[in-house]
Amino acid sequence: MSFNVDIDEADVAVLNQNLIKSKELFTSISRSLNKISTKSSTASIKIKPILKDVNKLNDNRNQLDSGLNLLSEVSNYASETSKYEAVLNNSIELIGLKKFIDTLTRSKVLLTEMKSNIKRFKGILINFENLIDKSELNLENYFQKSLKSNVMGTNKMNEIILIFQYFYSSSMSGQKTIDKIFMRSQSIKMAEIMRPHEEPTKPIKRSSNIPYEKGSNGINRYNNEMIKAIKGEIGLLNEVGAKINLNASAKDMFVLDIVRKVVNESYAEVIGNFNKVFGQSKILHNDLLILETIENLNHFEKFLNVSNIDVRSFPAFNENYHQLINISSEIFRELIEYSENRVKSVERLTDLNATEAVVELISRIRKLSEYNISLLKLISGMKLGSWLNLKPAVRFISVYTSVIPNLSDDIDETAPEHLLSCFISDYIDSIIINIEIGLKADVSLKKSMQGYYLIKNTILIETIVNRSQQLFNSLGNLGIERLNRLKKRFLKLFLDDWNYASYIIIRDMTTITTTNAVSGHSGSGMSSKEKEQIKDLFKNFNESFEDALRNYEKYNITDVNLRAYLSGEIKKLIMNAYFKLYDKYGSGEFTKNKAKYIKYNKHQFEQILNEKL
């Protein structure tokens, strides 16, 4: 309130009175304001708890709404998991693999979502996670069961691929788990496949006079089944790998891990059993079985290389394999020793028993030569001629060897093929030269007869060689040349009678010519001395020739090839000499009785040779 006071006109009393009234009014207003303030303060104190309760009620209402929403969400998850449990708690066979895996995949997605949204409900999460773990374990067991099947049909293969794809898409841990199960299962399966084939590989004890029948041991079947099983694993991995993007190195690792146990244990034991038997007797007692075994091992080794499987990954297998090679390489020394002893065991060599020995010994090397790969494997790394280092020393070397000096750098004397050719040639030398030694010990045998026995058996050896493609190839050009050198050596001995007849012509014709030149006879006719010399020449030749024919007929040669060869060599030797004699003195001017001395003209001479030879 405001008042306008005119100080000049107002009375002091009035002014004082107005001041007093104003003071009273202000005092009254102050008291009213104090009352209002007191009441406002009291109201404020009383209102605060009410607001707090209201806010609390609002919070509780919000929490209740949130809880109701959470319970609703949990209820939904529980309903969802219940559906999955209904599937996963049943057997895969009943539900079907694809539905089982699809449900399991969705369950894992749901579990991840639940862990994010209802993580406080640990009981629900744990139970559902346990169900998933149990289901994956069931899937692993089903996988193992599927792998045990002996028949891998299309349906079974598709199931295996589905399981692989599931675990390969889950986690690295899942991938490692399924890989481990697969490799272990397949390794066990391979061992079970090979187990029935192990027993038949064990060598059967035989008497020394009973030969091994080719293929009677189970090593061929064992090796073939092993290769077949590994090929099956490779094929399976190729098919599976294409679906799960398995690279080549990973596939090779799979195969190696699968086959390592069966090769390093089963196959190594098979070889070990061979080593025990072979090490207890002469190699020749089991020669064919040894070569058959090595041939299979070599085949297996090559198969591993082609399949990118390092054979060095199997230490026990390799150790036994190398031991087998070391034991068996003695076969070459034993064969040389056997060939000498076989011929030496014949007390008195005849046409019959010499041929029997040759047939027996050459037939043996022919059979062995069929295992060319094995022989090359055994002889590889050996020193040239080391198979002749025997005690007592081999005796044929001191008499003759058909060895041809190597004058060419083109021949690699360390090559297994060259070593094998040299060995076979030495073996043939040992047979035939030992027969020569035995025949020469019989002083009653003429040289020509000795030569006949030797050339006959050399031709027999040549015939057997020519009929055996593998033996012929193993000998090679060098070996055939060495065989020809033996033929030439014995042909010369055989032609001793014919050489003498031919020698008479050459000797006497030379003597007659020389005598005439010395005597200075230059007349148109022959001197008496020359005529007598010519008569003696024809007489001596006829006797020698007829003697050679008689001796030849005693041989009773039935072999067409042998007869053709010998008759050809005889004709080359004797016909040329006789034709020269006939051309010189065939006119018969040296005698009045031509028929007495000149029994054959050229045509007749050739005709009688054709008839008699």
From Swiss-Prot:
Its main location: other. Pfam families: Exo70_C, Exo70_N. The keyword Aminoacyl-tRNA synthetase does not apply. SUPFAM superfamilies: Cullin repeat-like. It is found in: Bud; Bud neck. One of its GO terms (biological process) is exocytosis. Coiled coil: none annotated. GO terms for molecular function: phosphatidylinositol-4,5-bisphosphate binding. Involved in the secretory pathway as part of the exocyst complex which tethers secretory vesicles to the sites of exocytosis. Also plays a role in the assembly of the exocyst. This is Exocyst complex protein EXO70. It comes from Debaryomyces hansenii (strain ATCC 36239 / CBS 767 / BCRC 21394 / JCM 1990 / NBRC 0083 / IGC 2968). The lineage of its organism: Eukaryota, Fungi, Dikarya, Ascomycota, Saccharomycotina.
